[in-house]
Amino acid sequence: ELPAIQNLGAMDVLCCDKTGTLTEDRIVLERYLSTDGNEDARVLRHAFLNSFFQTGLKNLIDLAVIDRADVTPSTVVPDSMLGQSLRDRYTKVDEVPFDFSRRRLSVVVADAQGKTQMVTKGAAEEMLEICSFVEIDGIAQPLTDEKLAQIRKQIAGLNAEGLRVIAVAQKTN
């Protein structure tokens, strides 16, 4: 198309939709990482609980999380996908809706034994501001300045790859 090629000379910026967000109206969950940078099913589990049980319109990120959990095998329920396993084992108790000043959304869920947990998902920087502990190898530890710097460096690296980083945190009652 000669006219299209001629127009390229007049362009200052060319934007490409390499992820399909604009052209396909969808997002794909690429990674679910713990604070040490390793893939961690607990991160996907908490993100799923938040995305699935929130009552508002599900945005593209929520749908990507739900889709990924629906094709990821459960480590708890044999011959089951993670998403279905979590749907069957948890019920929603309460919700703090997303708002643009907090830049996060929280849901409270309960398991069959009545044990509750609040799961919050939101913009990484805002989430880091409200967290005082970090889970390392399944153990909650104080979020030190050194660990915070390491997490921020990890986020910057992911952003440099063109990935949008969302953080998820949980607090068990």
Which stretches of residues belong to each language-model region?
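Conserved cytosolic headpiece of P-type ATPases
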Residues: 1-173
